[in-house]
Protein backbone atom coordinates (compact mmCIF):
# COMPACT_ATOMS: atom_id res chain seq x y z
CA UNK A 1 0.00 0.00 0.00
CA UNK A 2 0.99 3.64 -0.29
CA UNK A 3 1.24 3.88 3.50
CA UNK A 4 3.61 0.91 3.63
CA UNK A 5 5.82 2.49 0.96
CA UNK A 6 6.00 5.70 2.99
CA UNK A 7 6.98 3.86 6.17
CA UNK A 8 9.68 1.93 4.31
CA UNK A 9 11.34 5.27 3.67
CA UNK A 10 11.07 6.31 7.32
CA UNK A 11 14.51 5.77 8.85
CA UNK A 12 13.83 3.80 12.01
CA UNK A 13 10.89 1.80 10.64
CA UNK A 14 12.83 0.95 7.49
CA UNK A 15 15.60 -0.47 9.69
CA UNK A 16 13.12 -2.64 11.55
CA UNK A 17 11.65 -3.86 8.25
CA UNK A 18 15.12 -4.69 6.95
CA UNK A 19 14.97 -2.14 4.13
CA UNK A 20 17.95 -0.29 5.60
CA UNK A 21 20.82 -1.56 7.73
CA UNK A 22 20.13 -1.50 11.45
CA UNK A 23 22.36 1.12 13.09
CA UNK A 24 22.54 2.98 16.39
CA UNK A 25 22.24 6.38 14.69
CA UNK A 26 18.79 6.99 16.22
CA UNK A 27 19.63 4.89 19.30
CA UNK A 28 18.74 1.23 19.28
CA UNK A 29 16.15 1.46 22.06
CA UNK A 30 14.21 4.13 20.21
CA UNK A 31 14.30 2.11 17.00
CA UNK A 32 13.16 -1.02 18.83
CA UNK A 33 10.22 0.85 20.39
CA UNK A 34 9.21 2.11 16.96
CA UNK A 35 9.59 -1.37 15.54
CA UNK A 36 7.73 -3.30 18.23
CA UNK A 37 4.67 -1.06 18.04
CA UNK A 38 4.79 -0.86 14.25
CA UNK A 39 4.88 -4.64 13.99
CA UNK A 40 2.05 -4.90 16.53
CA UNK A 41 -0.06 -2.62 14.36
CA UNK A 42 0.83 -4.64 11.28
CA UNK A 43 -0.09 -7.86 13.08
CA UNK A 44 -3.46 -6.29 13.86
CA UNK A 45 -3.91 -5.45 10.19
CA UNK A 46 -2.68 -1.88 9.78
CA UNK A 47 0.70 -0.19 9.46
CA UNK A 48 -1.01 3.08 10.31
CA UNK A 49 -2.23 1.54 13.56
CA UNK A 50 1.36 0.70 14.50
CA UNK A 51 2.45 4.30 14.02
CA UNK A 52 -0.64 5.47 15.91
CA UNK A 53 0.27 3.22 18.85
CA UNK A 54 3.73 4.79 19.04
CA UNK A 55 2.23 8.28 19.00
CA UNK A 56 -0.23 7.24 21.72
CA UNK A 57 2.74 6.07 23.81
CA UNK A 58 4.37 9.48 23.38
CA UNK A 59 1.11 11.21 24.22
CA UNK A 60 0.50 9.23 27.41
CA UNK A 61 4.06 9.66 28.69
CA UNK A 62 4.24 13.39 27.95
CA UNK A 63 0.72 14.15 29.23
CA UNK A 64 1.51 12.43 32.53
CA UNK A 65 4.91 14.12 32.86
CA UNK A 66 3.57 17.58 32.09
CA UNK A 67 0.84 16.95 34.65
CA UNK A 68 3.60 16.17 37.15
CA UNK A 69 5.15 19.56 36.42
CA UNK A 70 1.89 21.25 37.44
CA UNK A 71 1.64 19.04 40.53
CA UNK A 72 5.20 19.97 41.49
CA UNK A 73 4.33 23.66 41.16
CA UNK A 74 1.49 23.06 43.60
CA UNK A 75 3.85 21.25 45.95
CA UNK A 76 6.16 24.26 45.92
CA UNK A 77 3.27 26.38 47.12
CA UNK A 78 2.69 28.22 43.85
CA UNK A 79 -0.63 29.99 43.49
CA UNK A 80 -3.52 28.55 41.50
CA UNK A 81 -2.79 31.14 38.84
CA UNK A 82 0.73 29.80 38.35
CA UNK A 83 -0.57 26.24 38.23
CA UNK A 84 -3.15 27.18 35.61
CA UNK A 85 -0.47 29.03 33.64
CA UNK A 86 1.79 25.97 33.64
CA UNK A 87 -1.09 23.76 32.53
CA UNK A 88 -2.07 26.24 29.82
CA UNK A 89 1.51 26.36 28.54
CA UNK A 90 1.47 22.65 27.79
CA UNK A 91 -2.21 22.33 26.87
CA UNK A 92 -2.78 25.40 24.69
CA UNK A 93 0.57 26.13 23.03
CA UNK A 94 0.18 24.45 19.60
CA UNK A 95 3.86 23.51 19.45
CA UNK A 96 3.28 20.77 22.02
CA UNK A 97 0.36 19.25 20.13
CA UNK A 98 2.45 19.16 16.97
CA UNK A 99 5.48 17.82 18.82
CA UNK A 100 3.52 14.95 20.38
CA UNK A 101 2.41 13.82 16.92
CA UNK A 102 5.95 13.87 15.55
CA UNK A 103 7.29 10.35 15.17
CA UNK A 104 10.89 10.96 16.22
CA UNK A 105 13.03 9.95 19.19
CA UNK A 106 13.10 13.51 20.53
CA UNK A 107 9.48 13.51 21.71
CA UNK A 108 9.68 10.58 24.11
CA UNK A 109 13.13 11.70 25.23
CA UNK A 110 11.81 15.18 26.01
CA UNK A 111 9.06 13.82 28.23
CA UNK A 112 11.42 11.57 30.17
CA UNK A 113 14.11 14.23 30.47
CA UNK A 114 11.61 16.74 31.84
CA UNK A 115 10.67 14.10 34.43
CA UNK A 116 14.36 13.55 35.23
CA UNK A 117 14.85 17.28 35.80
CA UNK A 118 11.72 17.32 37.96
CA UNK A 119 12.98 14.42 40.10
CA UNK A 120 16.37 16.10 40.43
CA UNK A 121 14.68 19.24 41.71
CA UNK A 122 12.64 17.09 44.10
CA UNK A 123 15.83 15.46 45.36
CA UNK A 124 17.50 18.80 46.03
CA UNK A 125 14.48 20.53 47.55
CA UNK A 126 13.06 17.63 49.56
CA UNK A 127 16.11 15.44 50.33
CA UNK A 128 14.59 14.08 53.54
CA UNK A 129 12.03 12.15 51.48
CA UNK A 130 14.80 10.46 49.49
CA UNK A 131 16.87 9.38 52.46
CA UNK A 132 16.81 5.58 52.64
CA UNK A 133 14.22 5.31 49.85
CA UNK A 134 15.63 2.59 47.61
CA UNK A 135 12.56 2.42 45.33
CA UNK A 136 12.78 6.16 44.66
CA UNK A 137 16.52 6.05 43.99
CA UNK A 138 16.15 2.96 41.80
CA UNK A 139 13.42 4.61 39.73
CA UNK A 140 15.64 7.71 39.44
CA UNK A 141 18.51 5.58 38.13
CA UNK A 142 16.26 3.78 35.61
CA UNK A 143 14.95 7.14 34.42
CA UNK A 144 18.49 8.40 33.94
CA UNK A 145 19.43 5.31 31.92
CA UNK A 146 16.35 5.72 29.70
CA UNK A 147 17.27 9.34 29.01
CA UNK A 148 20.73 8.20 27.91
CA UNK A 149 19.40 5.36 25.76
CA UNK A 150 16.74 7.38 23.97
CA UNK A 151 19.17 10.06 22.86
CA UNK A 152 22.92 9.59 22.65
CA UNK A 153 23.84 13.04 23.89
CA UNK A 154 21.41 12.61 26.78
CA UNK A 155 24.30 11.34 28.87
CA UNK A 156 25.97 14.76 28.60
CA UNK A 157 22.99 16.27 30.44
CA UNK A 158 22.23 13.46 32.88
CA UNK A 159 25.74 12.80 34.20
CA UNK A 160 26.64 16.44 35.02
CA UNK A 161 23.27 16.89 36.76
CA UNK A 162 23.84 13.82 38.91
CA UNK A 163 27.41 14.81 39.70
CA UNK A 164 26.37 18.33 40.68
CA UNK A 165 23.45 16.99 42.73
CA UNK A 166 25.70 14.60 44.65
CA UNK A 167 27.82 17.47 45.93
CA UNK A 168 25.12 20.10 46.43
CA UNK A 169 22.36 18.07 48.10
CA UNK A 170 21.88 19.40 51.62
CA UNK A 171 21.46 15.93 53.13
CA UNK A 172 25.06 14.70 53.14
CA UNK A 173 23.99 11.09 53.70
CA UNK A 174 22.46 11.19 50.22
CA UNK A 175 25.76 11.87 48.48
CA UNK A 176 26.80 8.24 48.23
CA UNK A 177 23.37 7.05 47.04
CA UNK A 178 23.32 9.74 44.34
CA UNK A 179 26.84 8.79 43.27
CA UNK A 180 25.62 5.18 43.14
CA UNK A 181 22.81 6.33 40.83
CA UNK A 182 25.42 8.06 38.69
CA UNK A 183 27.47 4.86 38.51
CA UNK A 184 24.38 2.83 37.63
CA UNK A 185 23.48 5.24 34.83
CA UNK A 186 26.99 5.03 33.35
CA UNK A 187 27.07 1.23 33.59
CA UNK A 188 23.57 0.89 32.17
CA UNK A 189 24.19 3.27 29.29
CA UNK A 190 27.64 2.04 28.28
CA UNK A 191 26.68 -1.57 28.95
CA UNK A 192 23.67 -1.38 26.64
CA UNK A 193 25.71 0.33 23.91
CA UNK A 194 28.48 -2.25 24.21
CA UNK A 195 25.99 -5.12 24.07
CA UNK A 196 24.24 -3.82 20.95
CA UNK A 197 27.50 -2.99 19.18
CA UNK A 198 29.69 -5.94 20.18
CA UNK A 199 27.15 -8.73 20.70
CA UNK A 200 24.32 -7.78 18.35
CA UNK A 201 26.78 -6.26 15.86
CA UNK A 202 24.75 -3.09 15.38
CA UNK A 203 27.10 -0.36 14.11
CA UNK A 204 27.27 2.89 16.03
CA UNK A 205 25.86 6.06 14.51
CA UNK A 206 26.58 9.72 15.06
CA UNK A 207 26.09 11.33 18.45
CA UNK A 208 22.69 13.02 18.62
PLM features per residue range, with description:
Residues 101-108, 150:
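Short acidic/glycine- and proline-prone juxtamembrane loop motifs at membrane-interface regions
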Residues 2-7:
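Short, small-residue-biased leader/transition segments that mark boundaries at the very start
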Amino acid sequence: SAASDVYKRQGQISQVLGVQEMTAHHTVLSTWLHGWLFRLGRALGSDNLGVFLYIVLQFLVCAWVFGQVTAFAARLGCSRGVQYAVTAFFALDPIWGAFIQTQVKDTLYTGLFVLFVLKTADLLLFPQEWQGSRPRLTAYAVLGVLCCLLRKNGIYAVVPMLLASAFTVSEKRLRRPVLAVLLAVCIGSFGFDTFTEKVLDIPAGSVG
